[in-house]
C-alpha cells in the first residue's frame, strides 16, 4: 500500500513556526532599539563616575585622541581648565580572564586612585582586587621601576611594593601590570606635552 504525503501536515506547522520566529525577531529588534540609548547613557555616566572616583580633584575630563591605545586616555582638568592629571584605562590577563583597570595619575606622578572596571576573578579570592584595602596600596608616587607584587611574610620592596591578595597572586599581578601600563602611558603623555 502506498502512503500519501499530506502537504497540509507539513506546510501548516512550518508556516506557523516561521511566523512565530518573525514575530519574536521583530520584538527583539524593537527592544534593542528602545534600550540601546539608555544603556549607552548609563555606561557613559558610569565611566564619568569612575573617572571622578580615581581623580576626585578634576572638574572635567577631555579625551586625548590618536594615542595608539585601545582606549583613549583623558586629561583631567580643574575648574579653571588646568591639567591636574590623567585618567588611563588598561587591562591585563588575570586568573579568570582580563582585568580592566582605570588609573588616575596626578601631574606630579602620584597615583590618585584606581578602580577595577571589569574582572571575572574567583569570588572571595581574586575578586577581592576591588576592595579598597588592596586598591589603596597604589596611592603613592610611581616608582622608577614601576609597582611590584610581594607575598605576605616576604620583605616588601622599599617603594612600589603591592602586597598580593591571599591565594590570588595571578590577579594581583594582573592589576599591577595594568597600573604599570597606565604609568607608562602617563610618562609618554607628559613627555609629549599633552
Identify the meaning behind each predicted range.
Residues 2-194:
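Flexible, solvent-exposed loop/hinge segments and secondary-structure transition points
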Amino acid at each position: 500500500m502506498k502512503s500519501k504525503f499530506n502537504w497540509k501536515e507539513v506546510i501548516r506547522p512550518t508556516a506557523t513556526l516561521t511566523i512565530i520566529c518573525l514575530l519574536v525577531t521583530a520584538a527583539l529588534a524593537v527592544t534593542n532599539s528602545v534600550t540601546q540609548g539608555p544603556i549607552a547613557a548609563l555606561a557613559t555616566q558610569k565611566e564619568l563616575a569612575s573617572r571622578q572616583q580615581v581623580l576626585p580633584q578634576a572638574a572635567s575630563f577631555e579625551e586625548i585622541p590618536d594615542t595608539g591605545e585601545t582606549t583613549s586616555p583623558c586629561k583631567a582638568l580643574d575648574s579653571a581648565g588646568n591639567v591636574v592629571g590623567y585618567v588611563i584605562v588598561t587591562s591585563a590577563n588575570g586568573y579568570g580572564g582580563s582585568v580592566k583597570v582605570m588609573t588616575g595619575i596626578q601631574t606630579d606622578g602620584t597615583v590618585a586612585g584606581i578602580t577595577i572596571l571589569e574582572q571575572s576573578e574567583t569570588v572571595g579570592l581574586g575578586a577581592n582586587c576591588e576592595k579598597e584595602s588592596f586598591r589603596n596600596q597604589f596611592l603613592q608616587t610611581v616608582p622608577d621601576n614601576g609597582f611590584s607584587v610581594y607575598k605576605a611574610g616576604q620583605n616588601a620592596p622599599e617603594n612600589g611594593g603591592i602586597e598580593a591578595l591571599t591565594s590570588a597572586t595571578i590577579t594581583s599581578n594582573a592589576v599591577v601590570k595594568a597600573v604599570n601600563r597606565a604609568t607608562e602611558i602617563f610618562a609618554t603623555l607628559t613627555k609629549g606635552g599633552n
